[in-house]
Amino acid sequence: KGVFELNPGECAMYRHSKLRRKKYYTVEAKEHTDNEVTTIEKTRYLLTDAIQRQLVSDVPLCFFLSGGLDSSIIVKTASMYNKEHKLGKINTYSVEYRDNKKYFQKSNFQPTPDYEFISMMSKNADTKHREIVLDNTLVCDALYESVQARDLPGYVDVDSSLLLFCKEI
């Protein structure tokens, strides 16, 4: 009772025994007027800038590589940055489930296994890659701990897999 989650773009201040919620940001939909070339240039600039700003670190960084579009763009951009600044290869990690390669069945949602794209991207970005293999029983056993770690309902096996994956790294 009395516990809530803030909405996106909202902050809260507790002062003088009162809680005040305030909206500080709202996304506005606007008409897109740029042509294809300009759109590509702006998108590339914004993505590269956002990723490179996160690469400044006193310790070596590592990256989750799922083989999907998001992680692949991040890994390739980070790899190019490290190469340009002579910082060496980046470390990438992926998660796999024991016997998934053996029992994989394609679907409309997932027509091919992730490991094919992970391997392709790791080679393309020239990373030091490590695959973490999780046992399905351990993923199930970690469900309760993952709910506690998130402190709110989440994505069931995805959360427990992520918890075990991070522990392994």
Predicted regions and their residues:
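N-terminal segments that mediate ammonia production and transfer
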Residues: 1-34
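ATP-dependent adenylate-handling active sites, centered on carboxylate activation for C-N bond formation
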Residues: 28-169
